[in-house]
Amino acid sequence: GNVAYAAKIAHLLSDDFRMYSGEDALTVPLMSLGASGTISVWADVQPQLVHDMCRAYLDGDVARARDIQIAGQPLINALFSEVNPIPVKEALAQMGMIEANYRMPLCPMADNTRAALTDALKGAGLLD
């Protein structure tokens, strides 16, 4: 995620071209540069919240979008603590949405990053 590069690209785009954030930690900043939304790993775990954040920004409630972005940062960090999609699969398994099955070359998370992910899920209100 390079905000300066995104600004350069946004300047070059025609009005009919849509730019999307691919970096969960930068969705709101990139929307301020003209991104229409996001292609998100975070949304795999909190789809409604990510939708609400983008919708708030598009509706002009930048403060609400910013607050959601900032509040989501601990979970975003945890979701990128190991190679994608391992943490998101682990998160969904902990939430009871899928079984924790991994095919090569994927493997279970390390104990320390799994514990940090669990803490982030609890902090986000997704686990008891």
Protein language model annotation of sequence segments:
Residues 60, 83, 109-112:
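Short coil/turn linker and secondary-structure boundary residues
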Residues 34, 60, 96, 123-125:
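Glycine-centered helix-boundary capping/hinge motifs
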Residues 31-35, 73-106:
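Conserved short secondary-structure transition element at the edge of the structured enzyme core
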Residues 28, 90, 119:
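Surface-exposed charge patches
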Residues 98-128:
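Flexible C-terminal active-site loop/helix
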Residues 1-80:
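Catalytic alpha/beta core domains of metabolic enzymes, predominantly
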